[in-house]
Every structure is written in C-alpha cells, then in structure tokens.
Regions:
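Hydrophobic alpha-helical positions that pack around
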Residues: 193-305
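Gly-rich Lys/Arg/Thr-decorated short loops/hinges at beta-loop-alpha junctions or inter-strand turns
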Residues: 131, 154-168, 291
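Acidic low-complexity segments
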Residues: 80, 85-137, 148, 204, ...
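Short histidine-centered loop motifs in beta-beta connectors
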Residues: 43-52, 56
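Histidine-anchored nucleotide/phosphate-binding helix
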Residues: 173-189
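Conserved hydrophobic positions within beta-strands
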Residues: 76-78
C-alpha cells in the first residue's frame, strides 16, 4: 500500500523459541476450567460432581447473545464446581476435573456439515471459538456483523509484535493447512472477496512458507502482507490501516470499513474444527522469560494450572 505508516516504535525482540517445534504438554493431574473464558455472559455448568467427562464434551453454556460454550479439555471425573476470585475482581465459576490421562474422545465429536451462512455461524458457535489473540470475543458474533453484505475483506492478524511470543509464528509453520482452510471457509460462507495475512517482516520463513502453500494450491484471493517489525503493528486499528489504508476512528468497527479481522490462531482453529470436529480445548502458548530454564512453545489443555 502507498499510504504512510502510523506511528510505531521499535522494541527489542527476544524470540528465543521461534526455531523450536511446538511440544505437547503432558496432561496434568487436575484441570480447573473457567466458565468465563470469553467476553460476555459466563456459562452455566452443565455437569456436576461425580460426572465422568471426555475430551470435547460440553461442560458449560448459556442462552445469551454474547457468550460461547465451553468444553472439556481432558477425560476424567468432575470433583467439584468451585468459585474463585477472577483476575478482574469478579467471581469465576470453575469446573474441577481429576484427569485419568486417557484422553478419551467424546463420542459425538465429528466434523460439522454446513450448507449456508446460518449453518456456518452455528458451527463456529458450537466450536466454542473466541478471539485467541487476547480479547476472547466470541468468533461467531464477529463473523456475522449486522452489515454483513457490505463486508468484503478478511484480515488475519499474524503480526505477533510482542517481544517474546512466538506461538503464532510456529502455528504458521506447523498448522498452515488449517489456517488456510479456516480462511477459505470464512470467506466462502460470509461472502468475502479477498483475504490478507498480516505478518511482521521478522518472520521471513513463515511468509515464504505460506506463500509457497498458497501458490501450490493455486489460491490467488489470499495473500500475505509484510508488516514492519515495529510495535504495535498487531493493534486492530493499526493493522486495518496498514493493509487497507482506511482509518478506524473512535467508535468505528472493522466491519464498518468492510473488514472482518481476527487472530491467526482463531482461523487455524476454524480449520481444525471443520476438519476434526474437536472444539476449542487447547491453546498453543509461549513459555519464556528470565525464570524459564528451557523456553519453548507448548500446546496446553485449557484449565491447566501454572
């Protein structure tokens, strides 16, 4: 794009784990799964003490517009429903599960079959997907804006401008097929013309890899977009401007500018859900910092405790 760049700053990068393949975290003895993992109304537990649950089984839901269902990340026995103080000062309801380490898959897990936009939106809600870049806004709502007929562009936020984190970087190298599939599904059912993956220039291997996969598949309506490695290129307003040249003033949403935008992990999870039927039960994350002897990226079950 020919427009000027918005003001940003250079921060030192400590991407120690960029070259490390993702590891799968061992299943812990106990998980505590919050019923408030999203913006909006918290879920109500649908299980009780003594119930045996399996991976992917529905644990909580609520009949509210802004919410998302929550599923079990492990197989094991529910040992209690607890309440604890949340990070923002409220009260969280937790489903506590003693794991059996078997990771038995819930029998009803199967890839969804959809034929139209309402079916797609329902499937995305059933998956429990929320924005996985930090905001945790329910994805099925973001994919169905009021002015959906005016939306034409998909933007994937893969900037990952934080100094230490490399989990999105590893996802782009390791889960490329799910990422592209998730984008194609969203574009097909929402009716979007073009898609962009915004990636900072300090990830040349991810850019080259995705470009090759797109070329090999003959996909021409999805492109990578190289961003400066400056902070905060991953901020919503900055990313929309960098890719489209359109300014998001106060009170303006991406959809108001014809854009649907979400994190790269979210789209990869869309692809994974439609491929396997497994809802959101795990998250890839970077473990790094001065107190960490062996920095790495791990896939951890939701509810695992530090």
């Amino acid at each position: 794009m020919s427009h000027k760049h918005l003001h940003s700053i250079h921060v030192n990068h400590y991407k120690h784990t960029a070259g490390c393949a993702t590891e799968v975290m061992p299943i812990p003895d106990v998980v505590k799964i919050s019923m408030s993992q999203h913006i909006g109304a918290p879920c109500k537990p649908l299980v009780q003490k003594g119930d045996y649950v399996k991976v992917g089984q529905l644990l909580g839901d609520v009949d509210a517009f802004v919410s998302a269902p929550i599923h079990s990340s492990v197989s094991g026995t529910v040992t209690g429903i607890e309440e604890q103080r949340s990070a923002v000062g409220g009260v969280d309801t937790l489903v506590v599960i003693e794991t059996d380490k078997k990771q038995e898959i819930y029998e009803e897990i199967k890839p969804p079959v959809v034929e139209d936009l309402p079916g797609f939106i329902k499937a995305v809600r059933d998956s429990g997907l929320v924005g996985l870049g930090g905001a945790s806004f329910p994805t099925h709502i973001k994919f169905n804006p009021k002015n959906i007929d005016d939306v034409h562009t998909l933007i994937v936020n893969a900037a990952e401008c934080e100094p230490f984190i490399t989990s999105d970087h590893r996802l782009m190298l390791e889960d490329t097929e799910d990422l592209i599939s998730g984008m194609q599904l969203a574009m097909k059912y929402i009716g979007l013309d073009e898609g962009f993956i915004g990636i900072e220039e300090n990830k040349p291997d991810a850019i080259a890899h995705i470009d090759k996969v797109l070329a090999d598949k003959g996909i021409t309506n999805i492109k990578t977009f190289k961003l400066q490695a400056r902070y905060p290129k991953g901020a919503e307003r900055v990313l929309v401007y960098e890719i489209t040249g359109k300014t998001m003033n106060a009170g303006v949403l991406p959809a108001d500018l014809g854009v649907i935008l979400s994190n790269v992990t979210t789209f990869a999870k869309v692809g994974e859900y439609f491929r396997t039927g497994m809802p959101l039960v795990s998250k890839r994350m970077t473990v790094d910092g001065d107190a960490v002897a062996q920095p790495k990226n791990v896939i951890a079950p939701i509810g695992a405790m530090i």
